[in-house]
């Protein structure tokens, strides 16, 4: 890091002449009891197992039940039976393995049992229905919008362009081993009047740090879901760049005897804002999914998301969960090309 900082310093002198489950988020050991009335919304991370859905309410689970039977109906109103993905126990507990987008939807269980009067042995059949709304979700992909400022001798002259290209190259080299890169870099030169210092010229530089550099999939080690890896990498990339600019201020104020070149980093000018994006077929909706507001939740029927936006768009002809396109719509997501 220090070597890179010194390299930039030399360039500057040369150019100037001198990261617990929430209410309905559960891990593999979670258990959710049924409720009558409005169904709970349950969020299951993509490719993970769902929590165990229990076909009775908590109060009833503490009582003796005679001759219980359980009937589970899944999305698309299909009767569910045990298979390699759906696990249903003899006591009516359901778990879905390796949860995918199309498995989202309404899960309904009907519990039938008998009450028996001790005096007359009279039997009465009781039925109760429990609804569970289950949604696939995935963590958002992180990127960072950054802005910094550098003083410059003048807003006229090619050395500003040269410095800008050198800075981008240095930043890319800092984070290339993390499969991250700098995108959408830009700068403008402004005249800034500072009290007691008069008028100076500054470069206002902006760029985005993105975790999807060419070949980024190689860092996933073959995993189906790579958000954990890419988000971990982008956090490291953010930290390295922040350390780099902090080191710039340190070098100038401690290694150059208080004499700064005409072009230098403006201390405390670094601004960092996290940007979230969702993969195609997923989006954020704080109103509909308040218990998973920061999640990228699968797009519901009648909506779709073709790109990395965080909003599911309306498309009345879509009948499935996780739609990435709408009939007669052809949007292509470029960010995730390898």
Curated annotation (Swiss-Prot):
Gene3D superfamilies: Immunoglobulins. N-glycosylated. GO terms for biological process: acrosome assembly; binding of sperm to zona pellucida; circadian regulation of gene expression; membrane lipid catabolic process; negative regulation of immunoglobulin production; sphingolipid metabolic process. Keywords: Cytoplasmic vesicle, Glycoprotein, Secreted, Signal. It is found in: Cytoplasmic vesicle, Secretory vesicle, Acrosome; Secreted. It comes from the Eukaryota. Residues 1-20 form the signal peptide. Belongs to the zona pellucida-binding protein Sp38 family. Is implicated in sperm-oocyte interaction during fertilization. This is Zona pellucida-binding protein 2. It comes from Homo sapiens (Human). The lineage of its organism: Eukaryota, Metazoa, Chordata, Craniata, Vertebrata.
């Amino acid at each position: 890091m220090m070597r890179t900082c010194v390299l930039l310093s030399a360039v500057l002198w040369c150019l100037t002449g001198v990261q617990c489950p929430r209410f309905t988020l559960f891990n593999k050991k979670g258990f959710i009891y049924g409720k009558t009335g409005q169904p709970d919304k349950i969020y299951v991370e993509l490719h993970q197992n769902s929590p165990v859905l229990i076909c009775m309410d908590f109060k009833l689970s503490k009582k003796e039940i005679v001759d219980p039977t359980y009937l589970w109906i899944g999305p698309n109103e299909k009767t569910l039976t045990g298979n390699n993905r759906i696990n249903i126990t003899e006591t009516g507990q359901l778990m879905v393995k390796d949860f995918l987008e199309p498995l989202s939807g309404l899960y309904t269980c009907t519990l039938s049992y008998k009450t028996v009067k001790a005096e007359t042995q009279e039997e009465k059949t009781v039925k109760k229905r429990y609804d569970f709304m289950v949604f696939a979700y995935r963590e958002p992909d992180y990127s960072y919008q950054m802005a910094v400022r550098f003083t410059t001798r003048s807003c006229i002259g090619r050395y500003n362009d040269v410095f800008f290209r050198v800075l981008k190259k240095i930043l890319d080299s800092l984070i290339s081993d993390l499969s991250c890169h700098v995108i959408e870099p830009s700068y403008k030169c402004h005249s800034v009047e500072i009290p007691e210092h008069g008028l100076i010229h500054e470069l206002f530089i902006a760029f985005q740090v993105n975790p999807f550099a060419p070949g980024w999939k190689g860092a996933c080690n073959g995993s189906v879901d790579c958000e954990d890896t890419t988000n971990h990498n982008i956090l490291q990339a953010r930290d390295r760049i922040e350390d780099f600019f902090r080191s710039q201020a340190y070098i100038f104020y401690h290694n150059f005897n208080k004499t700064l070149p005409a072009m230098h980093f403006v201390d405390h000018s670094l601004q960092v804002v996290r940007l979230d994006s969702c993969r195609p077929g997923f989006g954020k909706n704080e109103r509909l999914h308040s218990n998973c507001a920061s999640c990228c939740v699968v797009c519901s029927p009648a909506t779709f998301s073709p790109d990395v936006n965080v909003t599911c768009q309306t498309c009345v002809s879509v009948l499935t969960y996780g739609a990435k396109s709408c009939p007669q719509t052809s949007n292509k997501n470029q960010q995730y090309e390898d």
